């Protein structure tokens, strides 16, 4: 009997060893299986999908038929992704590859229709978070479920194509219109070692007959990395899409006065302007002071989105400014951010801006051009609105603010406020209106658009702009003469 018990014990011990070794082997194989590809999964139900705050997303690296790896396996590596695109710890920066060879047309962003109702304007490589991302800025039909959109990265050295699925984030100022601004974010896989010059963006759609269709376009990728040899302290201006009958005088006055106030560069979006305006902008463009991008909105969207898709132009200019601007402001041609106790915006920011600030917002007062308070003797000054109109509202417009931001610290910028800093600890400061304010030259009306400002209330004289009058008059005359020679 004892011999029998000993045999059973030895027999069971051998099987325990075999089972243990098998378990170790399975664990090692599964670990190897997990480290060869990517799957990103986030879960959150309801309409939060479109807000980008913890989405249900799957991004999988797929090997194409030319890959040396097995065609039958999609190998998976899992990690957590939040709505703004942060993954794990340890910043990963791709090295710069060879200079991307592009035509002038490829360098200039414009809307391209990926499919009906999905319009891509520009594509950016963003490495500000711990995980690099491709950010696709687009206008999209809002009433349908978000499409299945993917980014494909080609690894030339391995003849491999890696594909990740996009996460959608909706801009918060789409105002319930049918079309709105979105950011679609694709993870840059770890196998991608150099910043891509281009990516293929694909969309999968299903028609009423349940036939699956795929459409793809290749887009150039621009980088948000600081350009080499760029000088810090540059202050840029982003102007929303230009349209309508805008006079050349107003444009030149805006550029010249804003330059006196500290701006070094302007970005404009051309929706529909006259030939004289284009020639005037071209004059500044040759000097490197202005960039003009075509805003080629399809007709079918124009009455179905807020202010000609302004929010996408804001996002595009934000990303564009990350490369060589320390600060950038977003406002219209009839607005000026004016320091009251400093010589210019740069000296103001040098004093008030701290490392924990992502930006500064300024309250507005309205100067009504119908209240022509001066009759200047000089013809050139007669052409300058800011040197002629000195009656403004005594009451400020606290909700109609305009902002100056550090573009690298912003995830989402609004029209009148900073919508979302890149990191939660960054602060947006409201600047005391006795230090600086927005001078807005427009007809003053009691309206919801003006946040119910009572324009029938008291007006008062404000001749702050006289500080800049002499220099502005000289610069305006020089610029106008140059523009006239170009037009003749």
What do these predicted ranges mean?
Residues 2-225, 232, 307, 311, ...:
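Catalytic-site signature of metal-activated, phosphate-bearing donor transferases
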Residues 14-15, 174-178, 225-238, 242-243, ...:
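Active-site-proximal specificity loops/subdomain of glycosyltransferases
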Residues 254-264:
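Short, acidic, metal-binding catalytic loop of nucleotide-sugar glycosyltransferases
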Residues 269-272, 296-297, 362-367:
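Acidic carboxylate-rich catalytic motifs and surrounding loops in phosphoryl-/glycosyl-chemistry enzymes
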